[in-house]
Swiss-Prot record:
Sorted UniProt keywords: Carbohydrate metabolism, Cytoplasm, Isomerase
Predominant cellular place of this UniProt entry's protein: cytoplasm
GO molecular function: D-ribose pyranase activity; intramolecular lyase activity; monosaccharide binding
Oligomeric and partner information: Homodecamer.
Species of provenance: Staphylococcus carnosus (strain TM300)
Record: active site: H20
Gene coding for it: rbsD
Record field: catalytic activity: beta-D-ribopyranose = beta-D-ribofuranose
Protein name in UniProt: D-ribose pyranase
Length: 134
């Protein structure tokens, strides 16, 4: 059995294939994720699993250089924004973009996976951009 915190095989496989500048998204239940091979649906019911719990686990296995968040999270979900900032290393760049642009990244060529959680709070979506470990 795997010794690290991330047990889901699909999420683990997506992280394992990531190279420098590649992307992984973690999303709330309402994000319109394309139904393709990159879709990883973890949602069981409302709020299960929570976005922040999935993010907390993924960051243990992924070297991140930059994150993208919806500009709208500042006004509509400041508690989630605070929680995200608490999990992300201080040297990681944060870029705020319109939510409509976040949706475009779901099909971006560098995107290795779109994780759907059971999160039901607004704008609980993040794009993680990979760094190298050396």
């Amino acid at each position: 059995m795997k010794k690290t915190p991330l047990l889901n095989s699909q999420v683990s496989q997506a992280v394992a294939t990531i190279g420098h500048f590649d992307l992984l998204t973690i999303n709330d239940a309402g994000m319109p994720i394309p139904n393709d091979e990159r879709r990883i649906d973890l949602a069981v019911t409302k709020a299960l699993p929570r976005f922040i719990d999935v993010l907390e686990t993924v960051v243990t296995e992924m070297e991140i250089q930059k994150i993208y968040l919806a500009e709208e999270i500042k006004m509509h979900n400041p508690d989630q924004l605070k929680a995200i900032k608490g999990l992300i290393a201080e040297d990681v760049e944060i870029e705020f973009i319109p939510h409509s642009q976040m949706k475009e990244y779901l099909s971006h060529p560098l995107n290795k996976g779109n994780v759907r959680t059971g999160e039901i709070t607004p704008f609980s979506n993040i794009i993680l951009e990979s760094n190298v470990t050396f």
